[in-house]
């Protein structure tokens, strides 16, 4: 039996997103992935995911399964030089990229790595439905501002 979740549709200045809720960044860099996103994107524990930076307006990152990057999106050449160390940043075209494993429905990113994405312990990240391959965690921008006017669950 599938669980039912309640996403909120948020619209601001012509931009709209479905929000799962807020993910609070733990002191150790842990970020819980909302259960609905885990189900919708078939995210499994121990899978490798890539943190791909978002644009400057909203900040944050997309959480994409590494297998999708290499197969579906054809990023083999760009990812070839990624560090073998989990959570270590490599810049690609001036933007930070890193990989981590999903554990217990969330990710733990080293605090110094999160700083590369302008994210810090205690921050609330707005978790929204991204494109067809990845949930997105936003830091700022009009959608985040509008989301503050709604009652959304906080995952921590």
Language-model features: where?
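DNA polymerase processivity clamps
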Residues: 45-53, 121-129
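Intrinsic disorder/low-complexity detector
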Residues: 2-24, 52-105, 131-156
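Short beta-strand-centered segments at strand-helix junctions
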Residues: 27-42, 101-118
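Acidic-enriched, low-complexity/disordered segments with a strong bias for Aspartate over Glutamate
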Residues: 28, 45, 76-77, 104, ...
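Short linear sequence motif anchored by a di-proline
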Residues: 17, 28, 32, 40-48, ...
């Amino acid at each position: 039996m599938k669980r039912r979740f309640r996403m909120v549709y948020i619209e601001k200045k012509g931009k709209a997103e479905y929000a799962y809720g807020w993910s609070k960044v733990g002191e150790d860099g842990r970020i819980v992935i909302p259960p609905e996103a885990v189900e919708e994107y078939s995210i499994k524990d121990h899978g490798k995911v890539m943190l791909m930076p978002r644009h400057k307006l909203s900040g944050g990152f997309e959480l994409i399964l590494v297998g999708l990057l290499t197969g579906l999106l054809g990023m083999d050449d760009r990812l070839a030089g990624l560090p073998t160390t989990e959570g270590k940043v490599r810049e690609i075209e001036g933007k930070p990229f890193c990989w981590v494993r999903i554990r217990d429905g969330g990710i733990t990113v080293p605090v110094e790595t999160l700083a590369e994405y302008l994210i810090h312990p205690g921050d609330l990240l707005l978790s929204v439905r991204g494109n067809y391959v990845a949930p997105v965690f936003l830091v700022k921008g009009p959608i985040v501002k509008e989301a503050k006017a709604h009652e959304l669950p906080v995952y921590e």
